[in-house]
Amino acid sequence: MEYKHILSSNQISLKTFYIENPMIAIVYGAKGEICINGQTITVTTNLTLIIPKYSQVSCDVTNFFPTKPIELHTLVLSETELQSVFSLLKPLIKSGAPITRHLPDYHLSTPEVVKTNFTLLQQCLPLEHGTPSQETLFMQQSLFFILLAVYHEGVDILNIFRFNYDEPKNQAITHLITQDPQRKWHLEDVAKTLYTTPSTLRRHLSKEGVSFCQLLLDVRMPIALNYLTFSNYSVFQISHRCGFGSNAYFCDAFKRKYGMTPSQFRTQSRQANDPNAIATMASQNDESIKKVF
């Protein structure tokens, strides 16, 4: 579990990238749009975001107040820590049950309890005389109250974090590819991993409106955007790490999708964003990149 406090004096404009670990974040002093898994969110000053693992995220926000920076607090979670907190929340969630629908809402206006707990994290971390395990316990306690407050605002956190819910096949495949994008994935390999047949899997994907080849490309491209934005790998290295058969094919597919070459995108992205904010985000994404790649 890791807490970060990020200030950006400039806009934050990022093409679609992957969040490998579950995350809760609050945004202050921003306006614009954030997109999580295809759901477009209009940002108006104070917002709490609930982001499940392997989510696709993009954003284009600017300062709401001309003289004040955009302020972002993030709490990145591990699956083990999240399950530990959910085990404590489960009895309370069952007894309260304010949820009337099971569609994922990835955002809400920041409740006072959430704001208070993130303020405590900012003020107290790192603990002056604390051990890493004590810091983790402190963050878990804050997470408990944050999730409970979000739930009582009517957000189905069980659904968002995919506890006890079946996921569409395209999402299951997305998770597989994201964990090993460099692998030369074939429909037969994926079907075997998901304990089904290629024909059945192809039929499921057809019902969900996507082909396997297109899904493969749609998953690998945001991973490439991650590398172009947050790393210094060459375009050739990125094409290899993302599983493209050749650098030429990667560059051609990238230009067809985004209307510019990978090198042009990297230059544009770095010119458009606050370098300090990008550097902080890059350090936060570094561990996730190492785990996945």
Swiss-Prot record:
A single GO cellular-component term from the record reads: cytosol
- Secreted listed as a keyword: no
- InterPro entries referenced in this protein's UniProt entry, alphabetically: Homeodomain-like_sf, HTH_AraC, HTH_AraC-typ_CS, Tscrpt_reg_AraC-type_HTH
An annotated Gene Ontology molecular function:
DNA-binding transcription factor activity
The HTH araC/xylS-type domain, residue ranges: 171-268
SMART domains to which the protein is assigned, alphabetical? HTH_ARAC
Record keyword Transcription regulation present = yes
User: Which keywords has UniProt assigned to this entry?
Assistant: Activator, DNA-binding, Transcription, Transcription regulation, Virulence
PROSITE patterns linked to this entry: HTH_ARAC_FAMILY_1, HTH_ARAC_FAMILY_2
A Pfam family of this chain:
HTH_18
Where the record puts its DNA-binding region(s)? 188-209, 235-258
Q: What job does this protein perform?
A: Positive regulator of the expression of the urease operon.
Q: This chain belongs to which protein, by name? A: Urease operon transcriptional activator
Give the source species.
Proteus mirabilis (strain HI4320)
Q: What gene does this protein come from?
A: ureR
